[in-house]
From Swiss-Prot:
SUPFAM superfamilies: ADC-like, Formate dehydrogenase/DMSO reductase, domains 1-3
BP terms from Gene Ontology: anaerobic respiration
The protein's name in its UniProt record: Trimethylamine-N-oxide reductase
Family assignment from sequence similarity: Belongs to the prokaryotic molybdopterin-containing oxidoreductase family.
Pfam families: Molybdopterin (PF00384), Molybdopterin_N (PF18364), Molydop_binding (PF01568)
Taxonomic path: Bacteria, Pseudomonadati, Pseudomonadota, Gammaproteobacteria, Vibrionales
Compartmental location: Periplasm
Length: 820
């Protein structure tokens, strides 16, 4: 057998580079226009809606849909995804798995694959489902990994996979997600809903009524570039207005953040530096000032809250650790001077104050605490339910805060079996294991099967599953501690991945099936996840490249293997499904929105329902807390949760508290050995790991072909590092290479590598360096607490040095090493 590193043009006979990639990556747009005519088609994406110029069966050019007045530059990366050298082109099977089956786990990750036919691949997939259900039972199959997928109401790859696999047999699934695992678990106890995915007070109400806006670990200018559905970018119009008000001194905006983030640089607002992972200590001191100086809203606390009298003794040092949470106490932890803490507390109650929290601070050890304590602060300020006051946990996400029109978006493909239907293997014996596990504890399950953990008031017994099915999801991006993952994956017998790009998850799989991108199929999607601005027709722009197929086609073929394909499809093809979803949507909106017949909508490409009515979160509760009670056990804001207290957890008790971290920079545990905090926040130029494969767009920010690591110039100088140097970042969990970018936006002791950088190990061995710069090579795989058991990615300290020696090639991109 010959072994060659796959190049993009390999195996494509009698074609030129231009005919495969499309001229837009090789020639200028003006040159294309001179030689082509073609057609324009409307489609959409997480990055926004656009019109695509199609000529010769290829996408030549993209331009933002005219409704989007603030398009993101990431639209420039879409062609790079579609025509990426990292596309999964054919069904592939890992060579050693095919030769030795499960006994080859030690070579998993060596990226050596052999091409097979579609029939062979589906047969192998089905054979493994049969073997696992027969040999072990449903506890041995995990099909619950989920992610952002691609946009589109019909082609939801997770739903399509889980319906097909569920028709065959039961399986292990998950609860929660990586983005907001701690927040969505704690907030129902405190404010009665997850809050993180709830519509927030309209931006117009904030702009008209707020005197102070606190952006707490929140970077909306960066994060609002993308959306769960097709993004409208309406939020940026409000941010433009906010910038004007900041410049005129009409609104006081403060960013509480270790770094000067993109939003702070855009708004030119005040920045309050705080040591990483110390927000709760800072907030407790703020509460101390508000209470001892009698600045808090006593009437609001008495009318709308429960448990303040149990919480305040902790602040005063009369319970629990018996330490008074004074500004002097907090200053030694958070790095904010005592008088600055006092001034900040007084500012919070000087006028109408809107707290806007981001998600990063709940992705750390004890991540439940800052969100809970934020709600306590908002309650003490007393403005929850007022225009321009209170607290939000989502104004950086998917256009939350843009007034909703009330449009009911289209439904989707059914995830579950039809009512009354049973799977082929109707076995509900999970061998004493839990059927559902916390989303971030699946690696622990593989490594420690049978281990019992606490989770949200229940006991979970981790299942030692043997097989995974992963569809349109990249856990080798979003989970923590790559070397721990390598050890776990050596225990798995079979991993099947369905995707359009050859991610690290494909590298560590056994069977890889090529799905097509969202621009190679037909669909519809809501335009605006929360605003309900309209509906987008997602036209297929080009035919599926290589041998890729839609998830619908792939899973239909799988169900055909056990005679359930008609039940799976309900007798409809792609366009019949799309039409039916549109017609159901039209019926659901009768009397509210005039929607044309499907053909007219499909030809036009979009519907625009305008802007909705401004709204204030929790206003009804404030107006009448008895009639409009919250969803908490008491119906009130629970400063103290007696329900959580009854759980008896060590790391999440009955009210918010300061807990020291397992590791922390700036004088915290472990900082003598690894003194730098690694911030691995959402990227500025990707959606998580989506678009990292777009070569031309990646080149606009990569440094020597690697992911950037952002470093304070003084920290870099101390280590002999200049802008553009290669840097080795390391701790006891792993090591990576990244390209240095020096910036005063980052304080001493803090570095940033944005998550979503594709993992590219030099070898499959445990401990191998990541050649591109995936920060999760270094992060800690630890549950936030017994309550949420969510990811603690931002509890991570490291060291770094200038890289010396022979520079290894980047192994993240370009697909497998194909054995022929």
């Amino acid at each position: 057998m010959a072994i060659t590193r796959r190049s993009f043009l390999k195996g494509v006979a009698t074609t030129s580079a231009a005919s495969i990639i499309g001229p837009s990556l090789l020639t200028s747009v003006s040159a294309q226009a001179a030689e082509t005519t073609g057609t324009w088609k409307v489609s959409g994406s997480h990055w926004g809606a656009f019109r695509a110029h199609i000529y010769g069966g290829k996408v030549q050019e993209l331009k933002a849909l005219e409704l989007d007045t603030h398009p993101t530059e990431m639209l420039n990366g879409i062609q790079g995804i579609l025509y990426s050298p990292s596309r999964v082109r054919y069904p592939m099977v890992r060579l050693d798995w095919l030769k030795k089956h499960k006994y080859s786990a030690e070579t998993r990750g060596n990226n050596r694959f052999i091409r097979v036919t579609w029939d062979e691949a589906i047969d192998l997939f089905y054979r493994e489902l049969e073997r696992v259900q027969k040999q072990y039972g449903p506890w041995a199959l995990h099909a619950g990994q989920t992610g952002w997928n691609q946009t589109g109401a019909f082609h939801n790859c997770t739903a399509m996979m889980q319906r097909a696999v569920g028709m065959h047999g039961n399986y292990i699934t998950k609860v929660g997600d990586y983005s907001t695992g701690a927040g969505q678990t704690i907030m129902p106890y405190v404010l009665g809903s997850t809050e993180v995915y709830a519509q927030g007070t309209s931006w117009s109400e904030i702009l008209d009524n707020s005197d102070n806006i606190i952006l707490w670990a929140n970077d909306p200018v960066k994060n609002l570039q993308v959306g769960w559905n097709c993004e409208t970018h309406q939020s940026f119009g409000y941010l433009d207005q906010l910038k004007e008000k900041v410049a005129k001194g009409e609104i006081n905006v403060v960013s509480v953040d270790p770094v000067k983030n993109k939003t702070q640089r855009f708004l030119q607002n005040d920045h309050l530096y705080i040591n990483p992972q110390t927000d709760v200590a800072f907030m407790l001191a703020l509460a101390h000032v508000l209470y001892t100086e009698n600045l808090y809203d006593k009437k609001f606390i008495e009318t709308y809250c429960l448990g303040f009298e149990e919480f305040i003794p902790y602040v005063l040092g009369k319970s629990k650790d018996k330490v008074e949470k004074t500004p002097e106490w907090a200053a030694t932890i958070c790095g904010v001077k005592p008088d600055a803490i006092r001034d900040f507390a007084r500012m919070l109650v000087n006028g109408r104050t809107q707290l806007l929290f981001g998600w990063c601070i709940q992705r750390q050890e004890h991540g439940e605490q800052p969100y809970w304590m934020g709600a306590v602060l908002a309650a003490m300020i007393g403005q929850i339910g007022l225009p321009g006051g209170g607290i939000s946990y989502g104004h950086h996400y998917s256009g939350i805060g843009v007034p909703s029109t009330g449009f009911a978006g289209p439904g989707g493909f059914p995830r579950n079996l039809d009512q009354g239907a049973k799977p082929k293997w109707d076995n509900n014996d999970f061998n004493g294991y839990s059927r559902t596990i916390p989303v971030a504890r699946w690696i622990d399950a593989i490594l420690e099967p049978g281990k019992k953990i606490n989770h949200n008031g229940n006991t979970v017994t981790l299942p030692g599953f043997k097989m995974m099915v992963i569809s349109g999801c990249n856990p080798w991006h979003h989970h923590q501690d790559r070397n721990k993952m390598k050890r776990a994956f050596q225990k798995l017998e079979t991993v099947v991945t369905i995707d359009f790009s050859w991610t690290a998850t494909c590298r560590f799989s056994d069977i890889v099936l090529p799905a097509c991108t969202q621009w190679e199929r037909n669909d519809i999607d809501s335009y605006g996840s929360y605003s309900g601005k309209g509906l987008i027709a997602m036209h297929r722009l080009v035919d599926p490249l290589f041998q890729s197929r839609t998830d619908f086609e792939i899973m239909t073929e799988l169900t055909r293997r056990f005679g359930r394909e008609k039940e799976y499809t309900r007798g409809m093809d792609e366009m019949e499904w799309v039409r039916s979803l549109y017609d159901e949507c039209k019926k659901a909106n009768e009397g509210k929105f005039a929607m044309p017949e499907f053909e007219e909508f499909w030809e036009k490409g979009f519907l625009d329902f305008g802007t909705g009515t401004p709204w204030v979160r929790h206003a009804d509760f404030r107006k009448d807390p008895e009639i409009n009670a919250l969803g908490t056990p008491s119906g009130f804001i629970e400063i103290t949760s007696r329900k959580i207290g009854r759980y008896g957890y060590e790391h999440c008790q009955e009210h918010p508290m300061w807990f020291e971290k397992t590791e922390r920079s700036h004088g915290g545990p472990g900082s003598d050995k690894h003194p730098f905090w690694l911030q691995s926040c959402h990227p500025d130029k990707r959606l998580h790991s989506q678009m990292c494969e777009a070569e031309a767009f990646r080149a606009t920010y990569a440094v020597q072909g690697r992911e950037p690591v952002y470093i304070n110039p003084l920290d870099a100088k101390a280590k002999g590092i200049k802008d553009g140097d290669l840097v080795r970042v390391f701790n006891d969990r792993g090591q990576l290479l990244a390209g240095a970018v020096l910036s005063d936006s980052y304080p001493r002791g803090v570095i940033r590598i944005e998550e979503g950088a594709w993992y590219g190990p030099l070898t499959e061995k445990v401990g191998a360096i990541c050649t591109y710069g995936d920060p999760n090579t270094l992060t800690l795989d630890l549950g936030t607490s017994e309550l949420a058991q969510a990811t603690s990615a931002n509890t991570c300290i490291v060291d770094f040095e200038k890289f010396r020696g022979e520079v290894p090639p980047v192994t993240s991109f370009g697909g497998p090493i194909e054995v022929i």
